[in-house]
Design a protein with these regions (language model features):
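Bacterial Sec-dependent N-terminal signal peptides
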Residues: 1-41, 48
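Small/polar (Gly/Ser/Thr/Ala-rich) solvent-exposed segments
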Residues: 55, 74-92, 100-129, 147, ...
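Long amphipathic alpha-helical coiled-coil segments
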Residues: 124, 207-217, 263, 268, ...
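Periplasmic alpha-helical coiled-coil/stalk elements that build and connect Gram-negative outer-membrane
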Residues: 3, 10, 131-245, 345-348, ...
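Short, charged, amphipathic alpha-helical segments
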Residues: 115, 178-186, 318, 385-393
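Bacterial Sec-pathway N-terminal export signals of envelope proteins
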Residues: 32-78, 101, 109, 175-179, ...
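Amphipathic alpha-helical coiled-coil segments
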Residues: 56-71, 128, 132-151, 169, ...
Length: 404
């Protein structure tokens, strides 16, 4: 959070340009609607329903679900016809039909691949929803922080406005020099610039907020809540790592790779074919009977398809096994990354909680005491204005550091 205010002079112009550009694009791409105030839960529901990435992920799930029936593809049925002297010197006709098929486990394994791909797509959808909800949480946190910063700056501005008024009176009556008046004016100028910057940053956050919600008929405003961080401790629960959407998705990718390996091994199984043929016969038959063209005879065919040349099949199996190993290593790497990330954030969080307790128990009361005593001494003429400004700025810095 300190980034917004530690380098104001460097980034102020860049921020103004970004806000202006995004605002212009937003204005040009949609009509103007009255903003509707919503809370975080309402925002998540709207975003899940409208966000483009979520829509794409949903379509991917539907696509994979529709692909499951592809597993039972038997291939084309072959229908053939014969005309000519294929039985004797006479002209005969023949009709045939045949179908190739695999063993039942081949189709079962193919179905398993498509089902696992659907589960992987569902886990990606869940991950996308989680990332979207997390970004919305961050946006609300950022907005509430900026809102709290704005309130603090306004209180400080009100304080310096009062002191500027007193400084002008003191300068006009000859009780102070121009340095005191100029210093008071500059304090208000600085606060005005920070207030303007904070307002622009809040606008920028709302632009991204509405982009995530992707509602073409309504613009939304963020409902401000009390700014705080202690309620986020549940995010640091280490027992939830294995249920993290990224790990769940990585696990389904492993299972999908295993299913693909089994499906590739099905190439080593024999295939089968069955057929039926009906032909005519004319002339003297082997049974000493003379047949006309209207007499027809039937036969059945059964075949076995053996994978004699297996080099390509074994190569496909090896490739699938390597992909399985790749996904397993990806899972372990992602797990370690999440554990390390959680450990780092836990250390940072615990340190920040310690600092917050110190601020609330000691620094903030001290800041209030510094402010109260400084005001009394300044009003009584016991300290000059510059000493007063130093003390007040010290109290303000404590409040800013606590908020940051």
């Amino acid at each position: 959070m300190k980034w917004y205010f530690k380098q104001i002079k460097i980034y102020q112009m860049e921020i103004y340009i970004k806000v202006l550009a995004i605002s212009i694009l937003t204005f040009c791409g949609s009509e103007i609607y009255a903003q509707k105030l919503i809370d975080i839960n309402q925002a998540k529901k709207i975003a899940i329903a409208n966000n483009q990435k979520i829509r794409v992920a949903n379509l991917e799930v539907l696509k994979q679900k529709a692909s499951i029936n592809k597993a039972f593809d038997l291939g084309n049925t072959q229908i053939s016809g014969e005309l000519g002297q294929f039985n004797s010197a006479f002209f005969d006709t023949g009709l045939g039909i045949s179908q190739s098929f695999s063993m039942p486990q081949v189709y079962k394994r193919k179905k398993s691949v498509y089902e696992h791909q659907m589960k992987t797509a569902e886990s990606y959808l869940k991950l996308s929803e989680t990332n979207l909800n997390q970004r919305l949480d961050e946006i609300f946190l950022e907005y509430n922080y900026l809102n709290a910063k704005q309130s603090l700056l306004r209180r400080q501005d009100s304080l310096y406005a009062n002191y500027l008024e007193k400084s002008l009176i003191r300068w006009q009556t000859g009780e102070s020099d121009v340095l005191e008046k100029t210093s008071a004016e500059q304090q208000r100028i600085n606060l005005s610039r920070q207030l303007s910057l904070t307002s622009k940053m809040m606008n920028l956050v709302e632009v991204e907020f509405n982009w995530l919600l992707n509602d073409e008929k309504q613009q939304y405003a963020i409902q401000s809540d009390a700014f705080g961080i202690k309620s986020y401790s549940i995010l640091l629960d280490s027992t939830r790592i294995l249920r993290h959407p990224e790990l769940v998705m990585a696990d389904w990718e492993i299972q999908t790779a295993r299913a693909v390996t089994l499906a590739e091994k099905s190439g080593l199984l024999p295939g089968f074919s069955a057929g039926y043929k009906n032909v005519s016969f004319r002339g003297l038959g082997p049974d000493e009977i003379v047949y006309s063209g209207t007499d027809r005879f039937s036969s059945f065919q059964v075949g076995v398809q053996l994978p004699i040349f297996r080099k390509a099949i074994h190569a496909s199996i090896k490739s699938a096994q390597l992909q399985e190993e790749i996904q397993s290593q990806n899972y372990l790497a992602k797990k370690e990354e999440l554990k390390t990330n959680l450990a780092q954030k836990t250390l940072i969080y615990n340190e920040l909680m310690t600092q917050l307790d110190e601020f609330e128990n000691r620094s903030l009361p001290n800041a209030q005491k510094i402010r109260n005593v400084s005001e009394i001494k300044f009003s009584a003429g016991e300290i000059n204005y510059l000493d007063f400004v130093v003390l007040i700025n010290q109290a303000i810095n404590i409040e800013n550091e606590y908020l940051d």
